[in-house]
């Protein structure tokens, strides 16, 4: 499993990463499989999801979390509340 979550990073850190200039992705409540072929960093603006990596424990992510998904990660997304996030590959 390679999911790192930083809860409530400070604004200076987000600005230094350029988070607010990254594209935005939105998705309604749903469940679907996903594979990360390369590392992705995202900042959750709103919503909540449970992500279950193949062979690992589930993690909950939500508004205010900075999340890094490792390359070659296979997982199942269960979006509990419609999600909106900035992301960078």
Ranges and model annotations:
Residues 41, 66, 76:
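Short, surface-exposed charged micro-motifs
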Residues 16-17, 32-36, 53, 59-60, ...:
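Short histidine-centered beta-strand/loop micro-motifs
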Residues 34, 51, 85-87:
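Short hydrophobic/aromatic-rich beta-strand segments that constitute the beta-sheet cores
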Residues 1-5, 9-14:
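N-terminal non-globular leader segments, chiefly Sec-dependent signal peptides
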Residues 8-10, 18-37, 70-71:
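Conserved short histidine dyad/triad with adjacent acidic residue
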Residues 71-89:
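Ligand-binding loop in jelly-roll beta-barrel domains
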Residues 55-71:
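Short acidic-glycine-tyrosine-enriched beta hairpin
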Residues 36-51:
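Short, conserved beta-strand element in jelly-roll/cupin
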């Amino acid at each position: 499993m390679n999911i790192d979550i930083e809860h409530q990073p400070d604004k200076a850190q987000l600005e230094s990463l350029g988070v607010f200039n990254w594209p935005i992705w939105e998705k309604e409540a749903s469940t679907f499989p996903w594979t990360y072929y390369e590392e992705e960093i995202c900042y959750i603006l709103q919503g909540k999801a449970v992500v279950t990596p193949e062979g690992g424990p589930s993690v909950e992510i939500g508004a205010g979390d900075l999340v890094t998904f490792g390359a070659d990660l296979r997982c199942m997304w269960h979006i509990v509340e419609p999600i909106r996030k900035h992301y960078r590959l």
